[in-house]
A protein has these predicted regions:
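A short core secondary-structure module
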Residues: 180, 184-233
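Amphipathic, small/basic residue-rich leader segments at the start of a protein or domain
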Residues: 1-118, 142, 540-555
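A structural-propensity feature for long, helix-poor, extended segments
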Residues: 136-139, 143, 422-466
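A glycine-rich, basic-preceded beta-loop-alpha segment at the flavin cofactor/substrate interface
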Residues: 189-191, 227-239, 244, 251-282, ...
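Glycine-rich cofactor-pocket loops
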Residues: 24-26, 53-68, 274-281, 285, ...
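Internal maturation/activation junctions in enzymes
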Residues: 59, 123-124, 135-172, 176, ...
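C-terminal amphipathic alpha-helical interaction region
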Residues: 447-555
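Alpha-helix capping/hinge segments and adjacent helical runs
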Residues: 2-5, 247, 363-440, 522-554
Length: 555
């Protein structure tokens, strides 16, 4: 069993040749390699050893304050001293002004090494981006330097007991007071709602002004600090921390706001519009969490399979390592393919955002990456447990920890089912979205053809045709909901196949060209055929709303 090792060479290859990072303004390939090499060393040495400690010790609530393991404090001091939080922040606010894609690559490595530590610090980067786009100059000048320097950390406060996926049910209120506002209400499931790294947290809160319209249109966005400028507390208390399946060292808090002083970000009723910047970034961050933990699972499983001697092959004279068995190879290659393909999809989407801004393709790919990569990590962890056999079921080998830590990724930042409904409903009805994604796959087919990969060209062309036919059916269906799951999976597989066509086209530039070509063949022959099943499901007249009501009721 090994600790995570930052996959630096594969990340740099993906950034340069698949995401085409050099198209981003101010991208410097040499500097990116230097920064990420230094980051990888820090993460391997300081962050990766925290993972089993955090899982074992967890967080504690003592006298109303969250306390993290002592080892986390030592690592946070190095994180802060290294200036990692401010990688992409504007230099005028104390940041380093590097591309956001570079910060995302750092974030992937951080999540792979210790997802609980990552959860505690990473939201600040999204809040920095949100304030940079939406806040007044005086708010930016006060808060971005504090966040970039790790003087303060941050949280995002949306969820309430009655308002999970349906934010229109939010009840937390905001009342005008002088030149600001006061917040009253409660929020649950707040990652990083409190911590003792700095003892200071700035919360972005969705709340409803008292004269606001009902529903989503009545929500506004507020910045509420845990402490006021004189150092006194600001009416925010930690009611409890949740005991979770995983992420034991990530503080998931229930917060109470009682006359909490706050400033509005944007105008009244613009809460979701202003929060959109943070929510989209966080959805791609969750996709990268999936990539990172899938990579961790693949690393541990490959190490085990290469050393565990068990069974014989027909042509062997004695016991062999289990990586020589074909079914084990299937599982290992699935892990590796999901990791590399998910990384390629997500980095390319992040690069599109930074280079070109928003687009119909980005809107679609944000949901596709979030869903595909979070499903991929659970599959990768399950396969890792299976390869380990009985040992995989033991805590000592830490594959079960990856499964526990990653399972939440299919739930937060929009459940995967809701993302599927969004794609099969609203986004699919936008002709620009269909055209943009179609063109994205066509370009990948052309790249495969130009690179002399006829089998990949044919396989991806078949997936594209299946996707086109399914899109027409789903877009015109009066009841797309039962088709949404299969349509999202089909769309994800098409994007995954396109990513692998590009990876194969650039195989000679990869750290291990033989590995890329072998995995590309595996994806084509063993993974893409799944698309045909989901295409057929989309053709069926499926209905679930006419099922007997009684079977969904408790006797």
């Amino acid at each position: 069993m090994i600790d995570y090792r930052a996959p630096l060479a594969e990340i740099l290859f993906t950034l340069e040749h698949i995401a085409d990072a050099p198209r981003i303004i101010h991208w410097d390939s040499g500097l990116a390699a230097e920064v990420l090499t230094h980051a990888g060393r820090f993460i391997d040495e300081a962050i990766a050893p925290l993972d089993p400690i955090g899982d074992r010790e967890g967080v504690k609530l003592v006298d109303g304050r969250v306390h993290l393991p002592e080892a986390f404090h030592r690592a946070f001091a190095q994180f802060r001293e290294g200036g990692w939080q401010g990688l992409a922040a504007d230099p005028q606010y104390g940041g380093q002004g590097l591309p956001g894609l570079l910060a995302s690559a750092f974030s992937e490595m951080l999540a792979g090494a210790c997802i609980s530590f990552h959860m505690g610090v990473s939201l600040a980067q999204g809040v920095i981006r949100t304030l940079a786009v939406n806040a007044d100059d005086d708010v930016k000048a006060l808060w971005i330097p504090r966040l970039a320097s790790c003087e303060w950390l941050a949280s995002m406060c949306l969820t309430e007991p009655q308002a999970g996926s349906d934010l229109s049910l939010i009840r937390t209120t905001a009342s005008p007071q002088g030149d600001g506002w006061t917040i009253d209400g409660g929020k649950i499931f707040i990652s990083g709602g409190d911590q003792d790294f700095t003892g200071r947290v700035v919360h972005l809160v969705l709340a409803r002004t008292r004269d606001a319209a009902p529903g989503l249109k009545g929500l506004s966005l507020f910045l509420a600090p845990s402490h006021l400028e004189d150092g006194s507390t600001n009416g925010i208390s930690v009611v409890r921390i949740e005991e979770k399946m995983g992420l034991h060292a990530a503080a998931t808090c229930q917060l109470a706001f009682d006359g909490t002083q706050a400033v509005m970000i944007g105008g009244p009723g613009e809460g979701l519009k202003r929060m959109f910047t943070l929510m989209n970034v966080q959805r791609l961050e969750v996709a990268l969490q999936g990539v990172a933990l899938a990579d961790c699972a693949a690393q541990r499983t490959l190490s085990y399979a290469a050393s565990r001697v068990q069974g014989r092959r027909g042509d062997s004279t004695g016991p062999v390592v289990i990586s020589e068995h074909e079914d084990v190879r299937r599982m290992l290659m699935t892990q590796m393919a999901l990791t590399l393909g998910g990384r390629a999809m997500t980095y390319a989407t992040l690069a599109d955002i930074e280079a070109d801004g928003g687009s119909p393709l980005v809107d679609l790919m944000t949901s596709v990456c979030k869903v595909f990569c979070t499903e991929a990590v659970v599959e990768a962890a399950n396969l890792g447990i299976q390869v380990h056999g009985g040992y995989g079921y033991l805590r000592e080998y830490r594959l079960e920890q990856i499964l526990r830590d990653s399972r939440i990724s299919q739930i937060y930042e929009g459940t995967n089912g809701i993302h599927a409904l969004t794609v099969a409903g609203r986004l699919l009805k936008d002709g620009r979205t269909i055209s943009a994604f179609d063109g994205h796959i066509v370009a990948a087919i052309a790249a495969a053809q130009q690179s002399g990969n006829p089998a990949t060209t044919q396989a991806l062309a078949e997936v594209l045709e299946d996707w086109r036919q399914a899109s027409e059916v789903v877009a015109t269906s009066p009841h797309p909901e039962p088709l949404a799951h299969s349509y999202m999976r089909l769309t994800g597989l098409a994007a995954f196949g396109a990513a692998w066509a590009r990876l194969e086209s650039h195989a000679e530039k990869a750290p291990d060209p033989v590995k890329i070509r072998a995995l590309a063949r595996f994806v084509r022959d063993f993974m893409l055929p799944e698309a045909r099943h989901h295409a057929r499901m989309c053709q069926l007249p499926l209905r679930l709303d006419d099922m007997p009501v009684a079977i969904f009721q408790v006797a």
